[in-house]
Each structure stands twice: as structure tokens, then as C-alpha cells.
Amino acid sequence: IAEQNMFGMAAGLALSGLTPFVSTMAAFTTMRAAEQVRTDICYQNLDVKIIATHGGVSFGQAGTTHHCTEDIAIQRSLANMTLIVPADGWETANAVRAAVRWPGPVYIRLGRGFEPTHYESDDYGFEIGKAVTISEGTDITIIACGIAVYHAAEAAKLLRDQDGVSVRVLDVHTIKP
């Protein structure tokens, strides 16, 4: 396990003009290699794209050493870091394509890969920094990101069908900027 070295090498590749994509578990990206991500990549605003898997408690039975509930807060605090939390595989594909074109470091937080699919394709107007309106409503608004988007949409359907509540659901996939 050498996540620190991986991020140091990614910084070197970015300094040579390449756009490296690196991937490891969120706990190791955010905790084990925090200094390298912050100092080597973010401070220099390098074009490194980080794919962090197993965010939150998605690793289930692996326990607290592999859970990472603080990664969004930590990555959001880093200078120059763009932070995206896709809802599903379709949105992940859009996030990766957008990250390629986006200058500077990007952190894309994923679950374990068993998340339910919300979107039916990748053709819905994904744009870094702009929320996606899942449903329009006038009574309440639910704001969600990541796996919570699916659950927010399901809750909105229940509220509409059972109680007649008009619910707007927003997929705020970009946490920063």
C-alpha cells in the first residue's frame, strides 16, 4: 500500500503535461495521502483527477478503518479542489468526461459499485457546478448527492402518491465549486 507515492507520481506526471487519473479507496485518499493531495497536487493546482471508491460507509462489514465519512468535508476544504459526488454509474460517466475538460484537481467520490441506478442514460445535461432537477415541486425541496439522490427521488414519489405533497428534488452532484 503506497497511496502517498501514487499521488506524488501523479503530481510529477501532471507537471510534465499529462492528466493522470488515480484511484483508491476514499479512506486512503483522504487520510493516508492527505499531505500529498494537499501539498503536491492542490497547492500547485495540478491537473490530477482522483477517483475515490468506497465513500461513506459503503464498504459495510469492513469496519471503521475502511469507512470514510469525512472525505467530503476534507476534500472540500482543499485549495483548488473540485469535488463531485455522482448519483450512479451514468452520472459517474458524465463526471469523468467533465473532469477531463475541467482544469485543476478533481475528486470524484464513488460508493462501492452496488448503488441503485437513478438515471436511464447519460444524456441529461450534466455540468460541473450546476444541479440537476430530478422533479419539480412547490411544497418542499430535497437536496441530495450521491446515493442519496435515488432515495430522495423515491421519497418524493411516496410523498406525492401517499400525501399529495409536491416535492422538488435536486441532484447537487458538485459539492465544490
Set out the residue ranges of the language-model regions:
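Short helix-loop-beta junction
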Residues: H151-L170
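Conserved thiamine diphosphate
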Residues: A2-N5, G12-T141, Y150, V167
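Short, well-ordered alpha-helices that flank and scaffold nucleotide-derived cofactor binding pockets
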Residues: A11, T39, K157, D161
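Short beta->alpha junction loops
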Residues: I1, L170-P177
